[in-house]
């Protein structure tokens, strides 16, 4: 078997890691990832003095700054996308969701452009506002790179390398929008930490998680969760 480029860790490494532990936790896994991959490390210690700057990733976006949130530059359509949209509209017209407009890149070139757009336009504010919610706003300062990594248009290693290289560029460091350690670490944590941890957990416990009912719930989700009328703002509005 060829190794899967969609993830940084191999399944064999994850199995070996889990075999030594009765339970595993994301924080421990992430620290091991940082050490093993030698990412954001200085003399064996975490750059910036701590492993996670998660506490610095929870700021609200001030109303006076909401107009500064950059718009995403969505990719242009092409004949193959048009053909796919027509096919889905014809054969799956009753399916949930909309086929248009095209939101995500579908080529390697467009995916690379999307990645660079994030680094230049949104990366510097990613850390501060990673957990922020704004009414009627979807993207904020997020990278929106997961779809491209999931289907192989970008690899996680490629994304991490690009982020580290961009943050360490002299012109970026000396600019009005340098990449703080909170932004850089927070972004790296999502990819080498959470994304890899959840893949490892899913490989090991996926069947149990899919078929289990840990909380003993038996009621169906009400219609309000689907049409956005729960009265809970983050669900209805964001």
Which sequence ranges carry the predicted segments?
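Beta-rich, aromatic/charged-enriched effector core domains that present basic-aromatic interfaces
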Residues: 1-104
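Catalytic cores of enzymes that engage adenine nucleotides and/or redox cofactors via long glycine-rich
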Residues: 57-238
